[in-house]
A protein has these predicted regions:
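Exoplasmic/lumenal beta-rich domain surfaces
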Residues: 12-76
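Compositionally biased low-complexity segments at domain edges in trafficked proteins
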Residues: 1, 112-145
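Proteolytic processing hotspots in large secreted/extracellular or virion-associated proteins
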Residues: 111-122, 149-200
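Short amphipathic, basic-aromatic surface patches that mediate peripheral association
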Residues: 2-9, 180-184
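C-terminal beta-strand-rich structural cap/linker in extracellular carbohydrate-active enzymes
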Residues: 211-212
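Surface-exposed, short loops/turns at beta-strand junctions within beta-sandwich domains
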Residues: 76-82, 187
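Short beta-strand elements
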Residues: 84, 92-121
Length: 212
């Protein structure tokens, strides 16, 4: 959701988000200010300026924007009934909009968690290395556990294969390290090698250095 201001085309974030469960306040955020050392934790609250999470990931240490939180924002549906839910979004001037819906609780066997592919924990150092690709994500870089897959596509355009991680790695709190083996080492000046991120038909330089 966006907040608009008269006389400008700027887009502003929602000032306050309240989630009510059965008319009781369950989760509330109030964005006014936060300390400099909390800045990067905003990545866990708002993803790419599109999604505002109403739960707190286990690796999220952001404190100043949360007014009231029950069970880290995770609702346990443990009764066979309808849970009445209501979101209230409020802008800086106090104008608000709301949306209501219901969650229907039904008795069922809890599904077993599926771990498909490569599993990284937010709490420990993680290293994956296979064939011509490696990735190291230090403890505290992820805000929550990540389950992903990796595949490669041969490329004639680049000096290495194209490596695809799905789903894409979310914003990190700390830098990760990626290593890719060259399939063609033809540059005499090794400083000219660098990694790129591919998005559709466009490539974006990232960084990198050559190591034999």
């Amino acid at each position: 959701a966006y907040d608009r201001m008269t006389g400008t085309t700027n887009k502003y974030g929602v000032h306050q988000v309240d989630l009510y469960i059965d008319d009781s306040l369950f989760f509330s955020t109030y964005i006014y200010r936060y300390s400099f050392d909390e800045t990067r934790y905003i990545n866990s609250f708002a993803e790419e300026g599109v999604i505002m999470r109403t739960y707190i990931a286990p690796g999220n240490r952001l404190k100043s924007i949360y007014k009231q939180v029950e069970n880290r924002g995770i609702l346990h549906v443990d009764e066979e009934r309808a849970y009445r839910c209501r979101y209230v979004l409020t802008d800086y001037d106090g104008n608000s909009s709301s949306v209501e819906f219901s969650l229907i609780g039904k008795l069922q066997e809890p599904p077993l968690p599926k771990k498909e592919g490569i599993y990284f924990s937010y709490a420990v150092d993680n290293l994956y290395k296979k064939d011509d690709f490696g990735i190291f994500v230090p403890a505290g870089a992820l805000y929550e556990n990540l389950d992903f897959t990796r595949r490669k596509i041969p490329s004639k355009k680049y000096c290495s294969d194209i490596h695809i991680i799905a789903p894409s790695v979310p914003p990190l709190h700390k830098a990760a390290e990626i290593s890719v083996r060259l399939t063609e080492d033809k540059l005499s000046d090794k400083r000219q090698y660098y990694l790129v991120r591919l998005d559709d038909d466009r490539s974006y330089p990232v960084c990198g250095e050559y190591a034999n």
